[in-house]
C-alpha cells in the first residue's frame, strides 16, 4: 500500500497538484475538524465507487490512518484500484505537524 506523509500532502496542496482527497470519517468527526477534500464515509464507500477517481492520485484519510488503510486494502484487492494513497497518521498527524489550530479528538 502506498502512503504519504502529512508534510508531503501539504506540499501537494500548496503546489495545487491535481489529486483527489477523500475523508472517510463519519459526519460528526468532520464537525470537529477537517482538512478539505470530499467526504465519503467508510460505511458508504462501496455505494460511491463512481466518485473515486481511477485516473489520478487519490489520497484517503481518516483520524489516524487505520480506517483509511483498511478501505484502501479492500478497494485494491476487490476492485482493482492502483492509485490510492494512505495518509500516514491521518488527521491527527496533520493537526500535530501542519495545522495546530485543528481540534484533536
Model-found features: residue ranges?
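Short, surface-exposed ligand- or partner-binding patches at beta-edge/loop junctions that are enriched
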Residues: 61-62
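Rhodanese-like catalytic fold shared by cysteine-dependent sulfurtransferases
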Residues: 1-20, 24-57, 66-105
